[in-house]
């Protein structure tokens, strides 16, 4: 539900926490991020969205209308977790994948999931660089990320690239 740090950058997990405690910590961190974005939080629930915000969104996934997708379980768990804090994430399971790409290209989809094969080379340009082919789909325009992606492309040393790409993904 949330990153491993809260909105202030503090670690939310400690050694010895149970899975239930970690889950609760993640939900609390998520509420902190929502509150920082202008949402109203009352008694551990989202109760109002800021101007221009909403308490619901639709996550679109091309899972054949039957949940047949590698990300479907994670998306379902996220939807349930968000619902528990007052945010409704509706899952739109498409049977026709072309509807996903049409929606992405027209900018009418709130959130989406897709899956594809990876290449043996961990090059991140196509997906994460502002000028990469998929960047418009992710709406990622971060100069720092672009620099790390380009830095990783300058070496054939796999350990070096792994460290640079880990930093980029963090």
Regions found by a protein language model. Give the residues of each.
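Extracellular/periplasmic catalytic domains that process cell-envelope and extracellular macromolecules
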Residues: 50-53, 104-107, 143
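Short helices/loops that flank or line small-molecule/ion binding pockets
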Residues: 76-85, 98-109
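Solvent-exposed loop/turn segments at secondary-structure junctions
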Residues: 63-67, 96-98, 116-121, 169-170
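Extracytoplasmic/peripheral linker and loop segments enriched in polar/acidic and small residues
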Residues: 23, 84-100, 125-170
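Append "and occasionally in soluble cytosolic enzymes with long acidic Gly/Pro-rich linkers
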Residues: 1-80, 167
């Amino acid at each position: 539900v949330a990153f491993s740090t809260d909105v202030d950058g503090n670690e939310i997990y400690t050694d010895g926490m149970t899975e239930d405690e970690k889950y609760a910590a993640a939900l609390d961190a998520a509420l902190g991020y929502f509150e920082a974005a202008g949402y109203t939080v009352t008694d551990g629930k989202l109760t109002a969205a800021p101007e221009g915000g909403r308490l619901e969104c639709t996550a679109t996934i091309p899972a054949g209308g039957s949940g047949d997708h590698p990300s479907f379980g994670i998306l379902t768990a996220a939807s349930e977790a968000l619902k528990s804090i007052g945010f409704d994430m509706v899952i739109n399971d498409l049977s026709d994948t072309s509807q996903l790409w049409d929606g992405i290209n027209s900018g009418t989809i709130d959130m989406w999931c897709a899956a594809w094969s990876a290449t043996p080379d961990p090059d991140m340009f196509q997906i994460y660089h502002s000028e990469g082919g998929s960047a418009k789909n992710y709406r990622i325009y971060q100069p720092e990320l672009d620099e790390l992606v380009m830095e990783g492309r300058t070496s054939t040393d796999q350990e070096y690239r792994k460290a640079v790409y880990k930093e980029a993904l963090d």
